[in-house]
Amino acid sequence: MAFTLPELPYPHDALAPIMSRETLEFHHDKHHLAYVNNGNNALKGTEWEGKPLEEIVKGSFGKNAAVFNNAGQHYNHTHFWKWMKPKGGGKTPGEVEKALKDGFGSVDKAKEDLIQAGVTQFGSGWAWLTLKDGKLSATKTANGENPLVHGGKPILGVDVWEHSYYIDYRNRRPDYLKAFVENLVNWDYVAERYAAAVK
């Protein structure tokens, strides 16, 4: 099925001042839309045309850069918008809290490790809380890659491409990541992704 741009689950100004209307207008309305359009063009006539998104991401990795880069970024961003909410952050739901404590020792350590993964990702990419072999860990990937292509399941991801933070934070990526973790994360959606991942 063709890629389509999902609507934001909140108004463009709902995450301000942590993430501005201008950032979301560029990031969602222009960058994500470009991945959708370029992905649809790249898919034409390939073996992945009409396949589910996750299957396209896994199948095209290492085989077709044009398909993979756009499919990967479409997948990542489709979840990224849902991983945020107005007045996010706060308490983690029970099952996720237990999993974070099992994987990291504490919820605070999980947050610190996620931030560190994002800070140390050289150039464009993503930082993740990843479920692999029954355990949660903080990981990072370059460009449009995600844990799916490395045998893991993403339960939370944060975009560290400059277009995700440069309007609001300029070169202060660590400040953006801290603000994301403390004020934007939609832990209910993280819990939903975790429940699906452990099935």
Show which residues each predicted segment covers:
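Feature for soluble, non-membrane regions of globular proteins
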Residues: 1-199
